[in-house]
Amino acid sequence: MATPVKKWLLRVAPWFLPVGIVAVWQLASSVGWLSTRILPSPEGVVTAFWTLSASGELWQHLAISSWRALIGFSIGGSLGLILGLISGLSRWGERLLDTSIQMLRNVPHLALIPLVILWFGIDESAKIFLVALGTLFPIYINTWHGIRNIDRGLVEMARSYGLSGIPLFIHVILPGALPSIMVGVRFALGLMWLTLIVAETISANSGIGYLAMNAREFLQTDVVVVAIILYALLGKLADVSAQLLERLWLRWNPAYHLKEATV
């Protein structure tokens, strides 16, 4: 059993490196080793964050970016899950869909930005389409992989107990594939923000990416850093949310049990 002190150290350990980096960053800025034209001090970044927050501009852009990300992820994730289920559960579905999907997956979706702008312009549809496209493939692949790697002995045993069709899917196939599906979700959440960052910096008139690009035009490096930190925090928040869902939905799986840390 870990002592309370060890438990506390394990909880705060992930913050040691970020706090150390910020401390060195502030020191380098204070003594003049780091020019504010290259990188503003942490104090300057906090001031810029407070100014943008007080004016409401930051929250407006944050809400728009979050809306784009969630809508795009919902569309792409749903399509990826459905197509993955079809390919994973049906050999004919795999023959019909998998080759085409794999060909599309090997085309970098961000390379389609010029074409997407021609199709949709710079309105919301373009960003949502790119996010949906970027999040579709990780969930599709991991859904297919999860279904195909279910222990066939479990499936046969369930059938011997009279399970088939939808009950078999709900009680055996879906729980067995869920760990792999959640891995796909976590990958997709990372790609969601990556795609949105690029899309908003190229074709947008609102959002955090637009805020950063607009600040660049006026050499406001503090605002650019605020935008970068926001993207990092949003990505971390999305990953933590996925981890919590894993622990909730997979609490029956010993691999996802919360264990006491031991040293």
UniProtKB/Swiss-Prot annotation:
It comes from the Bacteria. The keyword Cell inner membrane applies. It is a multi-pass membrane protein. One of its GO terms (cellular component) is membrane. One of its GO terms (biological process) is sulfur compound metabolic process. InterPro entries: MetI-like, MetI-like_sf. The keyword Transmembrane helix applies. Residues 1-13, 65-68, 123-125, 186-187, 239-263 are cytoplasmic. Part of a binding-protein-dependent transport system for aliphatic sulfonates. Probably responsible for the translocation of the substrate across the membrane. This is Putative aliphatic sulfonates transport permease protein SsuC. The gene is ssuC.
